[in-house]
Amino acid sequence: TTTWRSLQSEGSYGMNLWLDNQGVYINDFPADHYYSQYSTAPAEVPAYGDSVWVGSWPDGGDTMPGDLKGDGYGNGSFPHSKGRFMGRFALERHGNGINVGFVDGHTERVSVQGLWMLNWHKENVPNPNIELR
């Protein structure tokens, strides 16, 4: 199995949904985490990145997924709950790195562990202690 699978509804890249303060799920997450518009987000906020889904609400407190290959579809390990959303970006692509595009337009290759150090939302607390499983 590969992280480049082809289910109809999955993504190859996913949006940082903390930048979508008009989305249908806005009431499911703390309002103070969202940016009101891209222009108010600092340059180091990720806008999108390699992902197994079209979007996510990553947080520095999320757990490291046990599956970095994207095999979680249909077996209960798909990262679709609070505390697990970073797993949509945490993949074995590009030598355990993820291509991330930031709100100012620049791109970077970020290590899987480095995802936990990014400022995904306004109240995010980076986690330098995350480890690969």
Task: Indicate residue ranges for each PLM-predicted region.
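Short, well-structured segments within or immediately adjacent to enzyme catalytic domains
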Residues: 1-133
